[in-house]
């Protein structure tokens, strides 16, 4: 099971050492790859990868496609069907990539209704210059 990490703080600054310590505590959830990124002055994300699908480096997270960032812990069972349905060729071999494409095309609510699987994810959308959007979601059963 992968580990996802996010920290949003609109009221002050981050103490880098404390943030690093918090992020490192989740490392046992994903020994294959870890990435921590300061996205903006008030938002940081991280990912510890336990690779099951998309076993190449292109499938590492955080995953950025067209100014949309995704970190996801889970498995999307119907990702191939959904790629075919929307006529998009995957950039990576990760089943989670489909979430970005669905979100871009349909928005968050309809995207969630299309996904079959278990997951928790964070989308960070900077495609609109006037604002930045963060969505946090999980599967209906709360498996992740």
Which residue stretches match the model-derived regions?
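N-terminus-centric sequence/structural signature that marks the extreme N-terminus
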Residues: 1-144
């Amino acid at each position: 099971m992968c580990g996802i990490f996010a920290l949003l703080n609109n009221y002050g600054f981050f103490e880098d050492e404390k943030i690093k310590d918090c992020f490192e505590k989740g490392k046992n959830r994903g020994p294959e790859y870890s990435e921590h990124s300061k996205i903006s002055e008030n938002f940081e994300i991280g990912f510890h990868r336990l690779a099951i699908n998309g076993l190449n480096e292109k499938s590492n997270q955080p995953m950025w496609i067209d100014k949309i960032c995704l970190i996801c812990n889970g498995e999307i069972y119907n990702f191939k069907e959904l790629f075919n349905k929307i006529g998009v060729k995957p950039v990576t071999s990760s089943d989670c990539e489909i979430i970005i494409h669905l979100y871009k095309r349909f928005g968050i609510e309809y995207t969630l209704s299309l996904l079959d699987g278990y997951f928790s994810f964070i989308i960070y959308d900077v495609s609109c210059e006037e604002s930045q959007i963060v969505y946090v979601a999980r599967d209906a059963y709360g498996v992740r």
